[in-house]
From Swiss-Prot:
Organism of provenance: Homo sapiens
Name of the protein in its database record: Olfactomedin-like protein 3
Glycosylation (residues): N177, N248
Tissue: Abundant in placenta, moderate in liver and heart, whereas fairly weak in other tissues examined. On term placenta, mainly localized extracellularly surrounding the syncytiotrophoblastic cells and very rarely expressed in the maternal decidua layer.
Coiled-coil regions listed: 25-101
């Protein structure tokens, strides 16, 4: 052992005392922290026990209430089923009574109309229409309906092109607008975010009402002539028909409709002044004028030139009419009430004279209380595309020969 060893031992002994003191304080600190944690843990256990007891008490109180609510729900469901059955039975009885006591048809037999000299630009008036196809069907009944979705405002139009080779859906929202939505197929239209996937076609002039028509790749619509704002309940001016090419997005033709003092043809659809329609025979227009403000007029149009080929004064009243469509040369007018009830075809006019009054069926639409802003007939599908307060609906039609008895 060298001479420096005692000095090293003395040095280590001098440091051992303070280190032992520090260890003692550290142990005391750890004991205090553990005691605090144990106290908090005990508090948490007490709170958990108290909360568990409160939850048990709440559950015991709620179980009887839930049993009572379940019994009341079952009672309400039973009552609703009973009421639904009674309503169905009443509707069947009403339908039976209506078939036993049908409303008087408004079909005009063409032996009563007489021909007159033609007027240039207006076409022949009240002459029997010569069918260009062998279409001889009439509506037997409106069999079913399917509500597709709700899109847009209370008034609008949706349709397919009856002559088109695609399944495109055209949607024209509103009564004074200039943009149409085009969907590739019906499935795309029914999607939740359908508007994002639709292409938009903007026309150079805003349309008037819900009388537009897509036919043969063209959009036909009515507009107010420039410089003639019109307005009010009656239009002092006539309307201009526009033929718009949907693919090229250009106006290819236009023509002033040969009728002055136009008024809405439908008493329940005040924004439409000319309602364009298409069937197996071609292009038609439904309108009314102040000259006879009680009844509808029908015109046959040339889809190429927009010329009016023939015109008829129909016996179908404007009052309570809401929409119309044409099938095989026969005009069918749909009537309703305000507030809305079940719509019904209550007037027909066969321009060819084939459908006689006693053979005209006047069916109700399926059980739905609404108001049709527009109806478009598709000859290929034998379906109606309807706009009902923002809902897009498809009606399937059952047909029969015009010569068959009802």
């Amino acid at each position: 052992m060298g001479p420096s060893t005692p000095l090293l031992i003395l040095f280590l002994l001098s440091w051992s005392g303070p280190l032992q003191g520090q260890q003692h304080h550290l142990v005391e600190y750890m004991e205090r922290r553990l005691a605090a944690l144990e106290e908090r843990l005990a508090q948490c256990q007490d709170q958990s026990s108290r909360h568990a007891a409160e939850l048990r008490d709440f559950k015991n109180k709620m179980l009887p209430l839930l049993e009572v609510a379940e019994k009341e729900r079952e009672a309400l469901r039973t009552e609703a089923d009973t009421i639904s059955g009674r309503v169905d039975r009443l509707e069947r009885e009403v339908d039976y009574l209506e078939t036993q006591n049908p409303a008087l048809p408004c079909v005009e037999f063409d032996e009563k109309v007489t021909g007159g000299p033609g007027t240039k630009g207006k076409g022949r008036r009240n002459e029997k229409y010569d069918m260009v196809t062998d279409c001889g069907y009439t509506i037997s009944q409106v069999r079913s309906m399917k509500i597709l979705k709700r899109f847009g405002g209370p008034a609008g139009l949706w349709t397919k092109d009856p002559l088109g080779q695609t399944e495109k859906i055209y949607v024209l929202d509103g009564t004074q607008n200039d943009t149409a939505f085009v969907f590739p197929r019906l499935r795309d239209f029914t999607l939740a975010m359908a508007a994002r996937k639709a292409s938009r076609v903007r026309v150079p002039f805003p349309w008037v009402g819900t009388g537009q028509l897509v036919y043969g790749g063209f959009l036909y619509f009515a507009r107010r002539p420039p410089g003639r704002p019109g307005g009010g309940g009656e239009m002092e001016n006539t309307l201009q028909l526009i033929k718009f090419h949907l693919a090229n997005r250009t106006v290819v033709d236009s023509s002033v409709f040969p009728a002055e003092g136009l008024i809405p043809p439908y008493g329940l659809t005040a924004d439409t002044y000319i309602d364009l329609a298409a069937d197996e025979e071609g292009l038609w227009a439904v309108y009314a004028t102040r000259e006879d403000d009680r009844h509808l007029c029908l015109a046959k149009l040339d889809p190429q030139t927009l010329d009016t080929e023939q015109q008829w004064d129909t016996p179908c009243p404007r009052e309570n009419a809401e929409a119309a469509f044409v099938i095989c040369g026969t005009l069918y007018v749909v009537y309703n009430t305000r507030p809305a009830s079940r719509a019904r075809i209550q007037c027909s006019f066969d321009a060819s004279g084939t459908l006689t009054p006693e053979r005209a069926a006047l069916p109700y639409f399926p059980r739905r209380y609404g108001a049709h802003a527009s109806l478009r007939y598709n000859p290929r599908e034998r379906q109606l595309y309807a706009w009902d307060d923002g809902y897009q609906i498809v009606y399937k039609l059952e047909m029969r020969k015009k010569e068959e008895e009802v």
